Amino acid sequence: MDVQHPPGVSSGTGDPGPSAPALLTWAAMAASKTAPGRKPGPAADPDQRVELLRAAAMLLAQEGPGALTVRRIATEAGYSTMGVYSRFGGKDGIVEALFVEGFHGLGEAMTGVPETDDPLTDMLGCGRAYRRFALDHPTSYAVMFERVVPGYEPTESAQIMAHGTFELLVGRVRRAMELGALPVADALETAQRIWAACHGWVSLEIHGLIKIDDPDGAAFERSMVALCGPIELSAPPPRATRASAPRSTRRRG
């Protein structure tokens, strides 16, 4: 089944594989989607949450946020609207679940990068995992970072969970500093700069705004290497002094 993504969100190309967490990939949702109008029996009730989230993800991917109503979600999943309210409390609860599951999947992708004796390579691996997750799951990425559903704001608990994913990068940066691979500085600030650069590149790439041919991510990785190289990321650039400023050689008339 071809999945149509909302305007401004391109389709992913990767296959998450059988080990990817449920509900994190829209391609997997499309492949296993049940037919609208199915009426599950009692034995299927434990799958109600999965089916409702799958239906919400499909609607968001195929038709955009305007189609994301409690009635449409329930119809697509083959349940009554009461099922949506009893499981999630309403539409915002479903979007919240998609938000949380997305960060859970991103966290698993980043923790899947092993620690080696080369912490900069490990950090690059985390950046690579971040990019791959975003390109493979662009709609999930949009829910997580672009607030594509009008009116939805993550709850405090969801934001704490999302921040935990960022802390994974902070830990990698701190380890690189401890091992001498990065100059000792504020690990939180340094990680924020790295994340901002990574997120900016990936967001532009998802929206088709990277105007270079980079299918294997080589240009992305060169950018990350330059950022993580022997530069004191948290130090301001040196300021030129009057004594060091070049003098003009042009004669005054």
Please report, for each region that a protein language model flagged, where it lies by residue.
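N-terminal intrinsically disordered/low-complexity leader segments
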Residues: 1-47, 58, 235-253
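Amphipathic alpha-helical packing segments from all-alpha helical-bundle domains
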Residues: 154-179, 188-192, 218-221, 225-229
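Hydrophobic alpha-helical connector segments
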Residues: 111-140, 162, 190-194, 240-244
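Short secondary-structure transition hinges
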Residues: 132, 136-171, 206, 210-213
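Helix-turn-helix
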Residues: 51, 59-93, 97
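Amphipathic C-terminal alpha-helical segment
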Residues: 133, 171, 175, 195-213, ...
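Amphipathic alpha-helical linker/stalk segments
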Residues: 100-125, 154-163, 174
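Generic hydrophobic, amphipathic alpha-helix propensity
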Residues: 48-57, 73, 98-102, 106, ...
